[in-house]
Amino acid sequence: MADKTVKELADMVSKTASAVQQQLVDAGLPARAEGDLVTELEQEKLVTYLKQSHGQEEKRRISLKSKTTSTARVTGSSGKSKSVNVEVRKKKVFEKPDPEKMAEELAAREQAMIESQARAAKDAEDRAATKKKSEERQAATLAAMRASLGSSKKSDDKNDDISTSVVVKKGGKTTIEVKPKEQPKKKVAATKPKVETAVERKAREVREKEEARLREIETETRRTQAEEAQKRTLEQMRKMAGQYTDQPATEVRKDEPLAEGLVGDALEESFEKERREIKRGTSSTTARGRGRRKNQDEREIKNRKNGLRSSQSAQHKFEKPVEKIVYDVEISEQITVSDLAQRMAVKAREVTKLLMKMGEIARESDTIDQATASLIVEEMGHNPVPVSDTKVEDDLQDAADERSSNVQTRPPVVTIMGHVDHGKTSLLDKIRETKVATGEAGGITQHIGAYHVKTARGVITFLDTPGHAAFSAMRSRGAQATDIVVLVVAADDGMMPQTEEAIDHARAAGTPLIVAINKMDKPSADPDRVLNELTAKEVVSEEWGGDTPMARISAKTGDGIDELLELISLQAELMELEAPLDGPAQGVVIESRLEKGRGPVVSVLVKKGTLKQGDLVLAGEHYGKVRAMTDEHGQRIQSAGPSIPVEILGLPETPAAGSEFLVLTDEKKAREVADFRTNRERERQLERQNAMRLESMFDQMEQGNVSYLNIVLKTDVRGSLEALLSALNELSTDEVKVRVISSGVGPISESDVTLAESSEAVLLGFNVRADATARRKSDTANMDIRYYSVIYGLIDDVKAAMSGMLAPEHREKILGVADVREVFRSSKFGAAAGCMVVEGTIYRNKPIRVLRNDQVIFTGQLQSLRRYKEDVNEVRTGMECGLAVRGYDVEAGDKIEVFEIQEFARTI
C-alpha cells in the first residue's frame, strides 16, 4: 500500500475523516489533519489495532510438515532380503513471540548483562589490588636485599659483579633472578671451589618458593582443564547419541567445531592417519588399487624431476559436496512462484508443495507477497533479501540528478485545455499563424500536439489537448507535464463538463491557471455569465478580487491574444523556471505512433538537459539510440534543449504516452532497468488477469447468460488507443460486455484479420488502414473492416452493435375488460358467463386474466366468445357477449381482462 492522506483513507473505508483521525489517535499515532499523509508503516499499525479491537488475534504460529521416504534392504528370518519403505516425518513450528514476553525477556537480559558487567568490574578491581600488593611485597624484599648487600663486609670483586633483576611475569607473578656479570675469559690453572654468599642463598630460597608456587598453580590448572575437557566430551557424546533417537537433539550451529575433548582428539587423529595413508599410498587395499597408486606415484616423481607440481597429491580425485549451496535471494514486494523457484535453483513444484503445507494454494504463475516469499526462502535454507520495487529506478534517477549542472532559465510549457469545440486549436493557429484546425478530422483535436513558438516575449511551448470526454487521460498527462494551464471557455457556451474536468486536472497537478474567454466576436457572447460560472467553481477572476488572470480574446479576429501572451510571460517570470542545460536529457513522452517505413515515432518533451542524436534513450519499457530527430515542422535537428518538443526515431517499440524518458550512457544499465519494468508490468498483468478471472467467475454465478462483443482495435497513436480502450470499457453493461481481444498501434495486418476471424470479433481501425495482404485475407474470409477518423462514429457504432445483442424488452398491454353479470350452464362448455365489455375490446385468441376483488386468480385462454349465439372473434366496448373460460369456472362479479405481450428493442 502506498502513502495516502487521511481524506483518501476515509474515502476507501467509507467513513468520515474525523472518524479516521480518532482511530489514528486511538492506535497511538500522532494526530493528523485531513491533508496529512499516513505512511505504510502507520497504516499497518492502524490495521493491526483495528483487528485487535474487533477481537481478531494475530496468527502467531505456522506449522510446516515434511516427509521423506527411503528404501532399506532387510534380511528376514528365512534368510531372504526384502525392501522396506522407511518414512521419516518431521514437523517444524514457527511461532511469533508475544511482544509482552519479548519485552520481559529483553529486560531480563539487560539486567543479567548489567549484573555480569558489575561482577567483571569487581573481579578486575580485586585482581588489580592483588597485583599491587604483590608488587609492593616484592619491592620491599628487593630493598631489604640491597640494604644487606651494602652492609656486608665479605663482599669482594666477585660479589660486586652479581646483578639482581626483578622479573614480573604475566598474571602478577614475580621472580627474582641473580646473575653474575659477564667477565672476559682468562686462562686459569685450576678452578677454586665456589662459596655461596648470603645474597645468593637468599635469592635461591626466594626462587625455590616461587617455583613451588608455580608448580601448584600449574597442577591446579591442568586438573581444571581435564575436568572441563571431560564435561565437553560427555556433552558431545550426548549430542552424537541424540542423532539416533526419535527426538531431535539440540541444534548446533554450522560454524561450531565437529567435536571437542576426547572425541574431537580421536576424530582428528583418524583424519590425520587417513591423510598420511593417502600420502604414502597405503589406503588402497586391492592389487589393482595398489597398481594405480604406484603408477600415480611414478608420475608424481617424474613431474617433480621436471620441476612440475602434481595437482593430485594429498587429495582425492572427487570430493562429494558436504554443504548445501546457500543463495542470497532477492525478493520484491510481489513475486511469482516460478521466479522465486528459479532464484533458489529449485523446481517450482517444490515451492508450491511448501506453500500447500503452509495453507496457501498457489500455482506457478500466481504471485505471492514479500513476507510469504521470505518465509519460503528461509525454510529452504537460503537468505532472503527484500528489495523495494522502486529501488532500481530511484538509483537511476539519483544518478541522473547528480550529473545535471549549469542551470539556466528555460521557456515555459503551456497547455491549452477546455471543452470540445471551444476554440483551443484555433487559438493556437492564430498564435502560430497556421491552419491546423481545418485539417483535423471532424474539426476536433484527437491527439496531443506540441509546438514551440517564438514571440516578442520569448519562446513559449504549447501543448494542445483534446476536449472530447474520452480523452481524459490525455488531458491529465498534459496538466502533469506543463508549467501553466490556459483554460479556454467559449463566451457563448459557458462552463461545460470538460471545462470542469480541466480545472480539476490543473488543481491536482498544482499548476497555475489562466482563463481565456474565447469567441468574444459573437453577438451571443456573455462573459459575465462565464465569470459567474467560474466563480461557482472557486475560480475567481482578478477583476473580482481573485487570483486567477483572465483575458477576453477572439481566436477568429486575433483580439486579446497579445494580452494573453503578456499574462503567460508574466506568470513564467514569477515562477522563475530553470533547468540544467548540460548533462543527460530527461523528459516525458507526449505521444507515440508507428509509421510505415519509419518505424516507431515518439514525440517527447525535454524537461532537463540536452537531447542529442546518437544518445541512448530509455523510455518506459524500451530503450534504443536516437537515429534521427525532427521538430514539429518535420525539419531535421541535431539537439534539443529544455522545454523543446521533438520527434525521435530509434526505439524498438512505441512506449506508453505519459511515461518518462531518460538518457543513459551504459547500455547494460538501460537493459537492466527495461527488463525490470517489463517484469513488473507482467506481474501486474497477471494480477489483473487473476482478478478478472475471479470477477468473471462471480458474474457467471450471478448471471446465467451474458453476451460478449469481441473487438480487435488498431489505432494510429498510443494516446488514441488508451482513450478508446477506456471509452469501450465504460460501455459494458450487465447483459452485454465489450471484450477487446487485441489492440495495438499501426496499420491492420493479416494476423489481425486472422485473429478477428477465429475469435468472431469486429475489426476496427481508427485513423489507420489495412495493408494489401490484410485486405485480401478479409475478402476471402468475407469479413468487414470498419474504418473511423472521428471517435464519435466509432463509439456510436459499437453502441449500436451492443444494442442488437440485447434481449428485447417485453411489456404487457391491456386490450379490454369485461364484467361478468350472470353465470349459466352450457351443455357444451360447462359454466358460461354473460358479460358486458366496459373497456377496450375483447379478443377471442388473446390471453386473459380473471380478477376477483381486484386480485388475479387465474390466467389462461378463452374457450368460446359469442354474441347472439354467433361465434365472433372480438367484441367492442358497450356490447354484451357470452364467453367461456377454458379450464376455470367464473362467478358473477368477476372481471375478465384481455391483454397481449409486446416486444420492444432495447438500446444502450
From Swiss-Prot:
InterPro entries: DNA-bd_dom_put_sf (IPR009061), EF-G-like_DII (IPR053905), IF2_assoc_dom_bac (IPR013575), IF2_II (IPR044145), IF2_N (IPR006847), P-loop_NTPase (IPR027417), Small_GTP-bd (IPR005225), T_Tr_GTP-bd_dom (IPR000795). Residues 518-521 are annotated as: G4. Residues 554-556 are annotated as: G5. Pfam families: EF-G_D2 (PF22042), GTP_EFTU (PF00009), IF-2 (PF11987), IF2_assoc (PF08364), IF2_N (PF04760). It is found in: Cytoplasm. Keywords: Cytoplasm, GTP-binding, Initiation factor, Nucleotide-binding, Protein biosynthesis. Residues 94-108, 120-138, 176-185, 193-229, 270-280, 294-303 have a biased composition (Basic and acidic residues). Residues 418-425 are annotated as: G1. Residues 65-84 have a biased composition (Polar residues). Residues 409-578 form the tr-type G domain. The keyword DNA damage does not apply. One of its GO terms (molecular function) is translation initiation factor activity. It comes from the Bacteria. Residues 443-447 are annotated as: G2. GTP binds at residues 418-425, 464-468, 518-521. One of its GO terms (cellular component) is cytosol. Residues 52-229, 241-316 are annotated as: Disordered. Belongs to the TRAFAC class translation factor GTPase superfamily. Classic translation factor GTPase family. IF-2 subfamily. HAMAP family: IF_2_B (MF_00100_B). One of the essential components for the initiation of protein synthesis. Protects formylmethionyl-tRNA from spontaneous hydrolysis and promotes its binding to the 30S ribosomal subunits. Also involved in the hydrolysis of GTP during the formation of the 70S ribosomal complex. This is Translation initiation factor IF-2. The lineage of its organism: Bacteria, Pseudomonadati, Pseudomonadota, Gammaproteobacteria, Moraxellales.
